């Protein structure tokens, strides 16, 4: 974050490479932008999980700590975690921390009757304040645009559709159809013919003599250029729309085909996608989610299998590659834990996961509304609960993978264990019948204890009576003996 990367030093390069590569350390390049925090992970987005969980956990441990040196160490660790999360550039991490902290504070405020009204007032004030900030400040506008996005692809880019037919290629430019075809002249030159939707020929003007690029003499297609090209001895054409090249070749069997970035001739097929999210929502995750949603219907009962999202998600999304994440780049993750779980484990598997998470969260809320927070163990459990909250929220815009999942499930298990310890220690959630039975048992014991002195006194009186009777009998005998 401060421009000091240990892995870019000679020591760091030796640390992360094999001995056989030590003579080529100068050729080792790093793809991370300068000033980006990534620790030992290959993706800075994963830091939103790690430090998103650690920040609330360390804060709770600080509150529960008793010794000064413990608090000092926790403050240093908290500052370092905040710096790393800031350096990762992950907006979703900060949003998850803020949302998790808000829920945790509301849980604490709900412990008292009067504080509940304070919590309700804070919720209302927070909603109103968020709306005002989002619509009146540049900071709020940026946050709002990051979350909701700003555009749909068909509204942002002029090329909306492509059709590879037998006789031509039809490109839809701002709702205007442009037909492009070509023929091979006797001298071997490629002659391009352009028409509008009514079949009217469109004139062409040489725009670049060196590349033989032609512009179209029509205002509707002012951003379109065509170029005759040869692809390994195969004649074809390139159509440039907004500076992006789309290559087509005419074949004898299938007519016109699209030459995709992998160099394969295919019939262009429009990929199904949802319009639920804007393309740039959550740093272009909206487009990925739109492409994932149509796949969900296939996996209501049975998922595709672990780590098979890459095979299920349509990878012939050429518009997305051209305008959003680049050609020959493929989405291997859904960038949403729950959507990916649905694809890979099915709807029922996803509902089971969500149900398990909700069970822990609801039970934790019930516990920490009642438990004694003067105990250190209580703050440990509450910190683990807050950490799980942040992870569950951050997972809406991130993937749970082998880099982050072990830490989460470890904290989740610790949270469950601490919750059980607190329930047992403070006798929480005891049923009314059990309470009544305990009270009755205590009452019976008390009655027995109260009755014990009475019984003892009765026994003592009986004993005294017997002693008196015997003394009377003895005195009579003595009197008779005296008479004799």
What feature does the model see in each segment?
Residues 462, 467-482:
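Intrinsically disordered, Lys/Arg-rich low-complexity segments
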Residues 48, 333-357:
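Membrane-interface anchor segments at the N-terminal boundary of transmembrane helices
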Residues 430-444:
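Short, highly charged, low-complexity non-transmembrane loops/tails of multi-pass membrane proteins
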